[in-house]
Each structure stands twice: as C-alpha cells, then as structure tokens.
C-alpha cells in the first residue's frame, strides 16, 4: 500500500501520466476492484463525499433565541431585573424567570421539531444520493457514488454528473459541461486519456473511466469552499420579517404613548410605570411565531415526502401553494413512457425489405442492456431479444445524443462484411441518407399520417462499410423505413388535469414531439388543443406570420407547446413569470436544468437525471401528474395553517397593546406582568398544535396577502381590546354584573379584579384562533382534535387560576365560580361577532360585489364542492370562446343550474364522442369489415381500445 499512501498525499501526478501508468500506480486493472479491496481503500481515502460541517447542537439551540422577536423578550427580561428595581421593592425576579422559561420552551420545541424534520429529510435524501455504475468483483452494478475509491472503473453516460475525478479509457470523445466548476458556458470535448472532474455533467457520449481522486481530494472538493453558498433570503423570510416588524412597531408606539402620558402628565410611580411597559412588551410580542411557522413547514414537508414529493427547500412549499401555471413534460409525466410499435403501420421504403427486417435493423441499432425507452421498445418487438445480436459481431455502438438525435451500430455479419444500422429522428435520418425530394415528400406524408393519430415516427437506415473500420464514413446510407411509436396517456392524467383546473392551476403540456401528436394527446387528456410549435414563437426562425401577434399573450393562453427545445423551456418560464404567474416546471433531463432553476418551483420527476435533481426544488419519487396535484393540495393546507397563525399573531399584538394601554391610562390600573406571562405561555402551548390542525385547502392559488393579514389583525384585535375595556369598565365602575347575575361586587378589590381581567383576556385571546383558522363560520368548520384538547386544557388551567389562586407577588386573588361563569358567558356572547368582522374585512378587501364574494365559495356557501359544477361550466364557456367556437344554443344557465341535467349532458356528450370514434374506426381502410372480428378475436373491449390506442 506504499504507493497508495503517495497518492493520498497527492505526490503522484495522476492527471498527466500515461493511462497505463495510472493503473500501475493505483494497483488496479481494467476489471475493476474487488469489494474487499474497495472497503480497504475507503478506510484509507475516506468516503467519496464532501465533509459536511457538523453544526454544534448547542449553538443551533441558542440560534432559536437569536431573532428580532426574541431580542424584544430578552430586553424585557433585562428590564425586569435592572430597571424594575425602584419603589422600595426588590428586582422583579418572577418575571425574569418567567420570560427565560418562555424563551427556552419556544427554542426547545423549534429545536426538536426541526431536528426530527431534518432527520426525516436526511433519510429521504439518502435515497436520492448520486448513484453511479461501477465495476466491482467483475460485475457492473449501480452503487452509491459515496463508495467510490481511486482505482474503481466507472461508466459515464449522457445526463450523469461525474461522481469523482477520473481519467477516460478507450471510446468515443465525450462532451462535458464544466460550467458548475469553471464557469465555461459551452461543453468541452474530452478524449480518451483526458481527465474529467467530479461535479461536471456529461452532455453527450458514453465511456468508461478509472477513478483517480475522490471526496475532498477532487478538484471540486478543493474548490468546494469557493462554491456559491449564498443563502438567498426567501420570500418567506421577508414576510416573517414584515410581520415581526409590524408587531414590534405597534408595541413601540404603545410604549411611547404610555411613557408620555404616565410620567410627565399623570406623574405615576416609577415602578408601576415600568411594570405597565413590561405588560406591553411581554404580551405583545408573538414570540412563538418563528417556532410555529418553522414547525408547520417541517411537519408539512414530512407529509409531502410521504406522498412522494421530497422538498429540498422548505420555502418551496409556499410557492407550491401559490402556483397557478404548471408546465408539464408530456413523456413520462402525462404519458406512461412505455412505447409500443404498431407493426401493421410500419412503412417500408427500400425494395426487397420486409417489415420484419425493418424491425430487426431498428433493434440492431438499439442497446440490448442499459436501454432507454425507445431501445426497449425496439428490442421488445422481436420474438426473442437475443435476435438483436444473433449472427453478428458488434464493433461499435454510437449512443443517442441531443445533437445527432440518432443511434447507430457498426457490426460484422456471418460472411465477414461490415455494416451499419441507424435509427433516429426522421429529419436527421433523411439528411443522413441525402434523399431525393419525392422520397422526402413521401416520408413527410407518412409522418403526418402517423401524427394525426398521435403516433411518433422513428426512421431506420442502413449502409455498407467497405473500408472495414469503425472510423470510416462508409458507403451511401439507405432510407429503409418508418416505424410508428405510441406512448399511451397515464390512466389518471385526464382526471388529474381536471382536478388541477378546479384548483386554479393551468396545466400546459411541453413536448419535443410534433404539433399533431401534442394536439392528439391534449385531446385525449381533455386539456385543450390550443397548442403552438415553440420554434414558431421563440426560436431564431420565428414564424413571420406570428410576428404581429403578442407572443407573451399566446404563451399565456396556450394549452401546450410542441417541438420544444431545452432553451425554449427556459424562455417559456421566463415569459410566464413576466406575466406575474407563479410557474412550476417539471423536467427529467440534463438539458432541463436551466428551466428548472429558473421556475418558481422546479420539479424533478421520478427517474430524473442527477443534474435535473440538483437544479430542482422538489424531487418526486413516484411517476405521474397526480403526485404533483396532491403536493399542491398539501402545500395549500400547510400555507393555510401559516396564514391563519399570522393573522392570529397580529390580532393578539393589537389586542394586548391597545387593551392594556387604555386600561392603564384611563383608570390608572396596573396589570401584573407575571399574569401576562402566564397568558403567553398557555397561548404558546395551544398555538403549537396549529401545525397539525385540520384545514381546508384554499380553492384557488394562495399567497401572502400582507394587506389582508394586517387589516384583519387590526380590526379583530381592536374589537377584542374594546371588549376587554368595556368589561373592565362594567366591573370596576358599575354594578351591572352584580345586578344582573347576582355575583358579589369586586369593584374595590384590586387583586380580584386582576383575576377577573386575566380570565377574560385569556379566554378570548385563545378562542380567536378558531376564528382565524376557518374560512367560513368558525363553529361550523371542525378544528383538529389536538387544537381543541390544547384549548380546553389551557382554559381549565386559566379558570382554576382565576377561581382559586392567591398569589401575592402576582397581585391576584380567587374570584370564585360565580364570577368565572359570568366571564365565560360574557366571552361567548362577544365571540360571535368576530366571524362577521372577518367576512366584512374580506368583502371590503376583495373589492367585488357581495354575490360574487359568495360565489367565491367563502363564508356562506352551501354549494357542493364549493360550486365546482358552475366553475366547470364557466370554464368550458371560456374555452369555447377562446377557441372561437359558438357557445351552446341552449341557455347555459338553465342547463347548469340543474345538477342532474348537467350530468346527463356530460353523458350524452360522452356517448356521442364514443359513437363518432367507432364510426371513424369503421371508416379506416385498415379496419373496413374487420373491426368487430379483430376485437372479438383478441377478446378486447372496443371502448377500452379507443381510449388507449389508435388502432
């Protein structure tokens, strides 16, 4: 192992010595390492990953006490012992200890929850750890990149992120994108023997390589500290700061008013003045806000991961809740990505060749292992997959790349003659074969015929290679035939797209296929056929006829785009964002990375390449669109909880500051800071459960409407403050409660008034959460069991304190059950108007007519599914108008008012569509006369056939 020590200390220049010497120095062969040798070397070189900075748990815990809201509380704690020290009384130790306890409780909850969420996320991310193909014990297998050691043989192909620094072995040159490391925007060509760096992306080609450096010894590992590690302040952070600042400013205004009135005007005692200021500071600060919101997000992201969507960035959840446009890849997301070939429709262009031979050539130009979807479909068409290589010797395989858009195999037949077979995009193959105009016309006619049925075309060509070498150009290429490929839609795609529209998310299909195929898939999925070829709108060769049209508007209104190149995806996202949309983009390939990064929510679909995963915000672990839609719903629930809480926090700040300010200044009554602390601690306990509360997701895309949050908070908070002031006046200055309810008068007992006031503030402060958490009447929308239990427990504690506690230091004395009952009754009566205030604010802010507000399925709606059917009808009419179709003759209102007739109408339409489809099938030449017999022979159901296949 002496030589390996030198390598570990980087004494050997493995980058530049000849490749044979690399094997000597690394003591390995082209057959790779054994597992034992691999384990031995891992102990020596360490795992192939960058060392993560271990965060100190104590510092992390203390970090939760380091934010503007906590600073205000810490200032209050210092005030309690440093300033509250006059008037012949000792420092206020009770309040000091209480504040510290409150801070510790908050930090502990944040710390535990974030830790749990972090562990869950780490476990999930481990499943997504970069994988690599490595040769161990003489066998190729997919392993985690972390196990690589110098001397391993790895395979690198299109879309892979290179897992370690390596030297390339024999094969075709690779195109490598090193922009992540060097900033070069263009891919560089790497020839056999060259070094490739860890972290760069393979853009073209496929080759084997020998690992020369791993982990911290790689070029990437050494430069890792230079890599961009800026933490961009998310939108969420900005909102948090804005709400925190609003609360702090409200308290500051209250304190300034108190100081001006109490000392120069009323000449109050120093100590009681300081205590009044402490009441505002302790009661007004929503100290639990960062905790509640981060816990809600952490629990939410865990829930999302259980549904198959892993969030890499917590704040992507709030963007997901506000997403109103989803650009979805067609292949694999809307469709199954399981291609099949319709053998009857294969077109042959060369004399003396039959359909079976065309299929055989296509299978030869495919991989037999490590296949992509098209390779698998071609080889799968043969009776036995081994036929693809039967009787021939493979010389060289050219893998698919986005530039040539074809694959090719050079092989030697049984007689020793050399041939090449190639399959790929028809345009590329036509150019390759240098076909005459009439052949091109015929090919295009067949492609169009396929496309009308939603079939993609694949062209096959062959050539002789008389020079008998893999580098030679060979003889002229012959265009052999065209194959129709069909990728059936997923069974749930159509239903999911309908769901998305109900949720206010517009799904746009993005496909590299021709326009006709895009439209056919759109028609099958019921998402509309208003599609454009993206090159006509965006590329260099824009369509002159579309020049005059507003491109941005066309992009906004389109149902999808066909013939899309990766750079168009980026452009589409950018244009939609300029139109103020929040855009989600799905992607899987290495070339989708820029668009995924640009989109508000980049979604890497299941089986995406490493490059796409690293650029995305959310990684899906299951295929299909339905995962995305359920993630949208979950995100909206999470967002709803956070929004409910922020409205609550603002209301409570206003209610405490205004209520206690008025009582202190009008009646010169000093409330005990310790009792405000008790209210704050009990409130926090209850509020923590909101992260698991049962909520209805918003029926439309949701966003932080700060105006609504502040307006609602100010109105509800002021109303509650007024209720408290009126209650205090009735108890302190009148005999109202004594006369009406027969309770004894406590107007002269300051300590009993303290208990009564404490209970009144405590009940309504916490009951307010039920108002802010609901979109309609708070007593109709059922809250989560946890929230109700926490509320009941906290109020039991508060009531028992008010009834029995006799604490001299807190200046409270028990008031008995009679008064407790009266206070509960008072609180319940004045609770009901809160909902009406809530609706009123929403009405004023929405700026819409009252009926429209009702229609917007908020507050009073009794409609099933929030009036979904009317929305469907409105949407259908809008779509017809958009596509220039006449609205139905019948007065649509009467149609859609009656639910049963709406259903009936749908059924009639379905049947009509089915009849038309059967008629069309019968008309097709291929089926004249045999439709029924073919169907019966194969034991198929004609209805299912036309939903899934174009026969």
Swiss-Prot record:
Phylogenetic lineage: Eukaryota, Viridiplantae, Streptophyta, Embryophyta, Tracheophyta
Protein name as catalogued: Plasma membrane ATPase
The residues that hold Mg(2+) are 588, 592
The function of this protein is:
The plasma membrane ATPase of plants and fungi is a hydrogen ion pump. The proton gradient it generates drives the active transport of nutrients by H(+)-symport. The resulting external acidification and/or internal alkinization may mediate growth responses.
Q: What does the record say about its membrane topology?
A: Multi-pass membrane protein
What does the record give as EC number? 7.1.2.1
- Spell out the family assignment given in the record's similarity comment: Belongs to the cation transport ATPase (P-type) (TC 3.A.3) family. Type IIIA subfamily.
| CDD domains assigned to the protein according to its UniProt record, in alphabetical order | P-type_ATPase_H
SMART domains assigned to the protein according to its UniProt record, in alphabetical order: Cation_ATPase_N
